[in-house]
Amino acid sequence: MKVTNDIIYVGVNDHQTDLFEGQYAVPNGLAYNSYVIRDEKVAVVDTVDVKFAHEWLDNVGAALGGTKPDYLIIQHMEPDHSANIYNFMKVYPDTTIVANEKTFVMMANFFREMDLEGRTLEVENGQTLSLGKHDLTFVFAPMVHWPEVMVTYDSTEKVLFSADGFGKFGANDVEEDWDDEARRYYIGIVGKYGTQVQNLLKVAATLDIQVICPLHGPILKENLGHYIEKYDIWSSYAVEKEGVMIAYTSVYGNTKKAAETLAAKLEEKGCPDVYVCDLARADMARAVENAFSYGKLVLATTTYNADIFPFMKIFIEHLTARN
């Protein structure tokens, strides 16, 4: 799939994984995105999950059309994006890997059997790599959401390769609302690092961005202001929904009745949106996502073994871990 005349999408869809990172339900699957930039020099941007090595390498080969890649750019070392580095280098051994210092430290630990002597290009923050007519500038984005992360800006095509930023759950062959699954992805995975995301958004504001190419989810070409605004809201912990979320746990139904009574009273008083959540039955990631969206949060819980009920304790731990 063409992103632009010179940029080809070579990612894959994953309908095998049911829990992303062992905890986030993904009923509509996932996408692991990767890109080929064709120019006088050819660059491949990131790899995909190891389960899809053959499909991805086939996609890369088709995009290359018989040419050889000059560079493999690694923006993020999480295994769903880095696992095929070694497989790629076995197929294309003359490729130079482009990454930053922290990435190469991780790479040496992840792939101890891989000899990269003479096949690396270590870049600094703000450094530019020319492919010919395409100039790629590397912007470090530490803790968005790993310490080595960087993003890549193509000033020729006005494309931002945003690593995990602006990603979402869901495979790219499934139609679904971007906001809901991008919010759940952001709050769950990146939500702890709002300050770092804000720093990256400030840099992005200085760039002329017409296309955003994330490592998960769809390529964003239209209404970019909407997506950037959402990231600004989420990363600044601003109120997205005017209303109240009531999160409760209940053993014999009494706390549930209290929560429902409060919800009814709030609605009578004109509260624009009341969301009641039974934490024992809700998807915890969805509950945490909603807690960050609403301006007001009410917690109602019974005790259990002389302590807070377990599901409420887990919920509070999720909130404090991301604050």
Where do the PLM segments sit?
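Conserved beta-strand hairpin/beta-sheet module of binuclear metal-dependent hydrolase folds
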Residues: K2-V60, V151-D154, K158-S162, T255
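Active-site neighborhood of phospho(di)ester-bond hydrolases with catalytic His/Asp-centered motifs
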Residues: V45-T47, P69-M77, I97-N100, L160-D164, ...
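Active-site metal-binding motif and surrounding structural segment of the metallo-beta-lactamase
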Residues: K51-V98
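Helix-loop-strand module that forms the ligand-binding subsite of alpha/beta enzymes
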Residues: R281-N323
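Metallo-beta-lactamase
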Residues: K2-N5, D49, A99-E222
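Short glycine-rich, flexible loops that bind phosphorylated cofactors or substrates
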Residues: T17, K221, N305-D307
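Short helix-loop-beta junction
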Residues: E260-V274, S293
